Amino acid sequence: MSVTIQGNTSTVISNNSAPEGTSEIAKITRQIQVLTEKLGKISSEEGMTTQQKKEMAALVQKQIESLWAQLEQLLRQQAEKKNEDATVQPDKKEEKKDDTNTAGTIDIYV
């Protein structure tokens, strides 16, 4: 009996600025890579029964799934933060425009 594991093991994260959590994302990505390599080597391990190999593979797969969930959450948080920052900046610009329109104007009542 053989255990075949298929999956996407490469993750590309590119961002010109280094947002918060980038090091955490890199750490999680590296853990996923290490576990994926480990998963591929389980079937060739000697000294383990087929059942033990299946259990080990299932455990490693669960760890990978958990790390993917953490990675997705971090990426979602970064996207939300980026969106919040983008919506705050236009408001500030509008306030400045309003200030310049009223600056230097004198109201005279007769």
Swiss-Prot record:
It comes from the Bacteria. The lineage of its organism: Bacteria, Pseudomonadati, Pseudomonadota, Gammaproteobacteria, Enterobacterales. Residues 1-20 have a biased composition (Polar residues). Residues 1-23, 78-110 are annotated as: Disordered. This is Protein FlxA. Residues 78-100 have a biased composition (Basic and acidic residues). InterPro entries: FlxA. Disulfide bonds: none annotated.
